[in-house]
Structure formats: structure tokens, C-alpha cells
């Protein structure tokens, strides 16, 4: 997947409509985690230094097509100004005469932030009129919001019908690592899939089984696979309606020569609580009434040896109830194995990101994806609308 990026186009003097993902956690008007804003800075700087007029657009929260005062992007503009060391003017809307006039007055290297695009109902409906009004502001569309690339909205896909579209640096990195791992991985290629439910990851597992050498399963979903193999799982979470599917997936792995790794031991608890009584047991010895809440130390050891010997590893989803320290050992163990792997290590969004941060090894990962749902759909092999509209590199 080879898409044009801002490195491949002339930016000097050009008006650039850049879609970013500034949907950051905020409490009482204070940003509590600015990761997404910081992630967009290299792209913004690159365009500023190249002499572009940078028009930033983002959604924030779910205002459902209404103006919601608490969902204005004013705190984001202030924070971005301090990160860039340059004043970023925040406009009161994202379309209309005032916006057009403000863009008209821009000089090369200027940056403005449009108001929350989801204040307009047309954004999520991919309304052509709204998309046209965005396109009218600029000469070029840059998509740097991988986190919303799975949505065909006016500011992520619709706008590209009317002006040329290329990737920002963050989007370029996502396509390079996520796309590269899935289309042309260095082998052995290992995927680690965790999380509570099989149903959330069916399409991911099905797609990965056509690509990987090893597939590691953990988290609550492992219980369903264990029960499908005939193990008693006590009071553990299980999707009884997915037992046949689990058997089918295991059969597919066998047919394709994929090594499927399951827990050999688990940490069980007498109830679902941080202070529950817990013990480590083999998977054929889960006591009646107890529940598996994490993978055990022998399992971590086995997973570790496969991970460190891999040339490409993609991870999505925790190995246990890692929000509770008592059941975080398996997830932390896998995070440390990823850090010890000298190959390409990719964290496919969601809870796994929090896990590598908790383990203190985030810096050692090759790539941490910024997309939750987008990463998941990418791993499912779906074409993402926000990526599909970008110009191909010939």
C-alpha cells in the first residue's frame, strides 16, 4: 500500500486542509492526555516550515450535529499553540463566510484550527455540500487522522472528491507499519490477540490466520477456546454461542500450518474483584466456581519464547483483567517479551497501548498505532475510507 504523503507534493504557498485527530480526554476544560495532539505536531511543523497555510480540522466528542459549548476546541488550540511555540487561531465555525475570510488572510506558515466538525450533522453523514465547503477552503487535503480513517465522513473522505489528497506523516507511518506487517511481513510473523470476547475479534483472527506463522490467544476469549477443546473452565467468562466458531478457527489454523498458542496455565480467582483470593492452576485444574482472570507464568514463558524469536509481531488486546494489578501479570509479561524482541513490534491500538505504557516499555516498540477501531478494521483486512481516498504513489 503505497500512498502519496506531504513529502511528495509542493506545499509552499498552498492552503492545506489537514484532518487531525484531536479527540483528546478532557476534564473541566483541561486536557488530561495530549498524546494525540503531540502525535500531529511533526506533520503540522513540516507543513509550516514548507511554507503552507495550515487549516486544521478535527472532531471532539459526540455533539451529534449540535453546537455543544463543552465540546469546543478552544483548549486544544491553546495547548497546540504552546507545543508549536506559535499562535494557533481557533475559529468559531468550520465553514461559512467568516471562515473563508480568515483563510483568505492567512500567510505562509500560519496555522488555524477550525471549530469541531461534528457540530454539523453533515460531517458524519458525509454530506457532499459540507465536503465541498471544506474543499473550497484549500488547494490540498492532508489526512493525518488514522484514528478516524475507518469512517467515511465529510472531513475524512468526502473532501477528497474535490481536491487532491495525501497522507500526513502520522498516517504515512501507520500505513507503512500496519500495512507492511499485514502485506509483506518479515518472518516468522506472530500475532497476539487478546481481549474479553471472541465476537469482537472474529474477523481479525480470520484475516490473521491467512498471514501469520504463530497466533497467540489470551484474555477472556481464551476461555471460549479452552472450553471448545473440552476443558472445564469453572465460572470463567465464556461465549457458549461461539464454541463451534472457536473449533472452526482452530481447524483453520491447523489446515494452514499456523501454530496456535493457547494458555497452559491461568490465574484463577474466587470472585471478580481486585482483592479476590487467587491461585495459579493448570488449565485442566480450574476449580468449580473459580474464574480465570489472567494467563499464568508458564503460559507467559511459552509466549515469551515465541515472541522474542519473531521478526514481526502485532499485538491487539490484553491477556487478562489488567486494570486490576492482581491480574496484570500476563499482559505485562507479554509487553516485556515485545520489548525483548529485536524484530518489528507493532501495538495495534486499544488496551494494548495502555499495557505497554503500564509496563514502561512503550519507547521500545517499533510502532504504537493511534487508532482503536481503525487499527482493528485494518487488521481485519478492510479497506479504510480515509486511506482509500489518498493518492497512490506511482
UniProtKB/Swiss-Prot annotation:
Listed GO biological process terms: gluconeogenesis; glycolytic process
GO cellular component: cytosol
A GO MF label: ATP binding
List of residues binding ATP: 201, 323, 349-352
Pathway: Carbohydrate degradation; glycolysis; pyruvate from D-glyceraldehyde 3-phosphate: step 2/5
Broad EC category: transferase
Places the protein is found: Cytoplasm
CDD domains registered for this protein in UniProt: Phosphoglycerate_kinase
Chain positions recorded as substrate binding sites: 21-23, 36, 59-62, 118, 151
Reactions this protein catalyses: (2R)-3-phosphoglycerate + ATP = (2R)-3-phospho-glyceroyl phosphate + ADP
HAMAP family in alphabetical order: Phosphoglyc_kinase (MF_00145)
Protein name: Phosphoglycerate kinase
Gene symbol of the encoding locus: pgk
